[in-house]
């Protein structure tokens, strides 16, 4: 957040509304994450902050919510994004507060809970299996998609495409300082290696760890402003929010959420699909992403050109801002005009945002 503010060139004192997406509780300050992050990023005590949970769509919703705050006149500047530390996801004891009178008790893995359908379908991987069946997607289709995601991400990293998007973080260890400046999740693989992986969620299924997104940690933020105020203060925006939408779908095929959300967002933006130059479609699972591409008729050459979540990871509450950042940077790299960021949401929703490069 601090780096996003610095890059914007705006005065932190003017950042008066922060919206942060977060899903998995990790510590005692988790309920305060938006407020703590904003104050530690240098915002004044007079600023306000809001933590939201729209599951996988949380950070993209935070961008939308910040835009809405500006449109409503609640703020001139806003910050939208998200954070997720899945590696530290907490365990919940429902019995400890009032005492377990006798017998065994259990702990609930709140990280896995976020990845589990709330209506009894099971792990989100089962919803991907449902889509593979519905849209006739073979194991080979999914593995080929996963391999392409890995290859595109590896190429983008080698070419330094993410250098301007990632803020290096240095931590001290017993062996000295370690700097993280490159995504850890991508890994070289082959169709043969992917074919050897066992189904992860269903006996004789086709969804594996190799063609699904990972368990990851990240934070990502965008600074938003009212156009007139930004111009008056000498800031040149990278893009504008041209349209957005959230839509509901049956929970057992929650991965189809981007389909209606994208249609509505494009309509609100006054655009047709063929006018979209860059598409960031979150890869929760290969079966899910392939289904969205198939139904909407996306041109695969425009989708996740620098790799997607299967390769780069899916830190649930942060991913939306990450793909928005990727989308906007790719628009500037290529000189294209319109971009789309869209993703499915557990429980049966989808979100989509259209950006125009400025």
PLM ranges: what are they?
Residues 9, 141-232, 295, 300-302:
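N-terminal extracellular/periplasmic Venus flytrap/periplasmic-binding protein-like
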Residues 18, 22-77, 118-124, 188-214, ...:
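Conserved catalytic cysteine-centered active-site region
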Residues 20, 127-129, 162-165, 242-311:
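Active-site pocket-lining segment
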Residues 71, 77-130:
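Flexible glycine-/small-residue-enriched beta->alpha junction loops
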């Amino acid at each position: 957040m601090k780096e996003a503010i610095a890059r914007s060139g705006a005065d932190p004192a003017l950042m008066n509304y922060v919206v942060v997406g977060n899903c998995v509780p990790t510590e005692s300050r988790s309920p305060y994450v938006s407020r703590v992050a904003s104050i530690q990023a240098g915002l004044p005590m007079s600023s306000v902050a809001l933590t939201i949970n729209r599951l996988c769509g949380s950070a993209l919703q935070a961008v939308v919510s910040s835009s809405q705050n500006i449109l409503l006149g609640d703020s001139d500047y806003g910050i939208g994004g998200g954070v997720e530390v899945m590696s530290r996801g907490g365990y919940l004891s429902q019995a400890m507060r009032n005492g377990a009178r006798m017998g065994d008790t259990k702990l609930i893995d709140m990280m896995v809970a976020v990845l589990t359908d709330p209506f009894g379908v099971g792990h989100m991987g089962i919803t991907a299996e449902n889509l593979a069946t519905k849209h006739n997607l073979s194991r080979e289709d999914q593995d080929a998609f996963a391999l392409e995601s890995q290859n595109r991400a590896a190429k983008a990293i080698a070419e330094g495409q993410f250098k301007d998007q990632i803020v290096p973080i240095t931590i001290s260890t017993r062996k000295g300082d370690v700097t993280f400046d490159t995504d850890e999740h991508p890994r070289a693989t082959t169709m043969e290696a992917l074919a050897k992986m066992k189904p992860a969620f269903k006996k004789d299924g086709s969804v594996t760890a190799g063609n699904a997104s990972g368990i990851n940690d990240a934070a990502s933020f965008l600074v938003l402003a009212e156009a007139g105020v930004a111009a008056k203060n000498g800031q040149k925006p990278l893009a504008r929010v041209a349209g957005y939408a959230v839509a509901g779908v049956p929970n057992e095929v929650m991965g189809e959420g981007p389909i209606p959300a994208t249609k509505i967002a494009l309509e609100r933006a006054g655009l047709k699909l063929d006018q979209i130059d860059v598409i960031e479609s979150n890869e929760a699972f290969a079966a899910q992403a392939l289904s969205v591409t198939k139904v909407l008729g996306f041109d695969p050459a425009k989708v996740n050109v620098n790799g997607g979540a299967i390769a780069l990871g899916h830190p649930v509450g942060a991913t939306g801002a990450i793909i928005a950042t990727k989308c906007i940077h790719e628009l500037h790299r290529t000189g294209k005009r319109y971009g789309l960021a869209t993703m499915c949401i557990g429980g049966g929703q989808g979100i989509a945002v259209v950006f125009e490069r400025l």
